[in-house]
Amino acid sequence: MDTGKRLVTVFGGTGNQGSSVVRSLLAHKDKLFHVRVITRDPTSEKAQACAKLGAELVKADGFNKSETVSAFMGSWGAFVNTNSDEEIYKIPGGRSDYDLGSTVLDATKEAGVKHVVYSSGLNLCKYTNGRVHSEGFESKYYVEQYGRRKGFQTFTPIVPASFMEAFLAESFCQSLGGFPWFKRDTGEYLLATPPYGGDERMPWVSVEDDFGDIVHGIFLDPDSYHLKTIQGSSELISFEKMVEDFMEVTGEKARYVRLKSWVDIPLDGTSCREEMRAIFHSMYSNGGKWFVPDESEIDTATTLKKEAKLAQGVTDGSLTAFKDWIHKQWERRLPN
């Protein structure tokens, strides 16, 4: 395996996924990776946080191909993630997330990047026979298919599981009953979901704690993961078990209620509720397969995490269980 210094350029490095990748690569004990972050605003607080960790900042707009080619020049590898929720994509007839993703991959290829890890999404429409559609998920899926045909030395799509960090957003919590931060009038926390499907265990990932390490593991041996879809998961866990773990670590009362169907998630005019309905509709239709057509597994992520932590000089390379994640978040919220 090549032992020279490797420049990895991160597109989307100021976001949750990208910043996790930046932190992990820069923590390599032998400083194997030099990290460059492409950003539209190098003066932003998030960009400066990357710089303080030791990342190089380069200004470029992903829609500007020539700028982006220059930003990727000299890179051995690239991690690419785009934000499918940008307001610009809501303009009828305007640019799309597919336009951005495909342009960025064109730029990486033109710049001579050998190894690309791309944060992909789910094709809900395809695997529900057209019953469910999500522009955000599907645009990433189609960019992935485009990337597979670009002829990179290695191209590895990683599909993130549902983010544990979603529980830090009030809109997400309230769409499922308020758990784990908003008590009911009864004095307990309520988690209410439709059936998920399969064995009811849903894949979740701690983006902060695990996602970057999983990507780090890929970059340690990219040839072994060429064209293999990586499941970016920390744990497979049922909602009922989440409530049990929450009560165990917090000592608070909580209850799980299973709704009859995805249509029982109440709408409130926000895209969050619509997306939740789409996800539960799709997952139940697919027998609980988040990574359809594949069954969910964490063996690959477990291996990649361990390899990354060893490269950082850390012997405990365990993935983050929801129980540990919620305990950490609960401790952060307690008054000093």
From Swiss-Prot:
Superkingdom as given in the UniProt entry: Eukaryota
Gene Ontology molecular-function annotations: oxidoreductase activity
Reported biotechnological use: Malbrancheamides have the ability to inhibit calmodulin, calmodulin-dependent phosphodiesterase (PDE1), and induce both endothelium-independent and endothelium-dependent relaxant effects, suggesting their potential as vasorelaxant agents.
Keyword Kinase: no
InterPro entries per the UniProt record, alphabetical: NAD(P)-bd_dom_sf, NmrA-like, NmrA-like_oxidored
CDD domains per record: NmrA_like_SDR_a
EC number per UniProt: 1.-.-.-
Record keywords, A-Z: NADP, Oxidoreductase
GO cellular component: nucleus
Binding-site list for NADP(+): 12-17, 40-44, 61-62, 82-84, 140, 163-166
Family: Belongs to the NmrA-type oxidoreductase family.
Role played: NmrA-like family domain-containing oxidoreductase; part of the gene cluster that mediates the biosynthesis of malbrancheamide, a dichlorinated fungal indole alkaloid that belongs to a family of natural products containing a characteristic bicyclo[2.2.2]diazaoctane core. The first step of malbrancheamide biosynthesis involves coupling of L-proline and L-tryptophan by malG, a bimodular NRPS, to produce L-Pro-L-Trp aldehyde through reductive offloading.
Protein name: NmrA-like family domain-containing oxidoreductase malD
Taxonomic lineage: Eukaryota, Fungi, Dikarya, Ascomycota, Pezizomycotina
